[in-house]
Amino acid sequence: MIAQRAALIGAESWPRQPLLIPAVDAETGEPIVWDAAAGVPLVRAVAASSAFPGAEPPVTVDGRRYLDGALRDGTNTDLATGAHTVVVIDPLAHRHPRSTTDGAHLVAADPGTARLLDAERSDPEAWTAAYQAGKARAGAAAEELRARWRPATDRG
């Protein structure tokens, strides 16, 4: 799984921009949030934060086993406290409606795409249709975000 995540993210070192990666201790249920200062390799933090029970095994970091940060909170928007702009991309938001941090903009599947996402998962045609619908939704979401987004120079 570590190698898969390394290939997926295409980077070995933490970015210069602030990045917080949440996970959950598999034994205690305690949440943890890693950043560049934590001393955890980026790829290992990403792998731990995406180790969902039943799909991937927990990932060991500093002798502890960790699971997907979504088990802490599906969106983790509380980690963005103080941010000017927060964008939450949650294509499955229709399954588990929840509130987001004040000011956060939620990008979710429209009703038609949601139906496709909920279709029979073993049908490759359903995946293709869901992918195409997601691409179309991304274009609409980009326009919505463009209308809301203000560059730092416009914030005063």
Which residues does each predicted region cover?
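Patatin-like phospholipase
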Residues: M1-G156
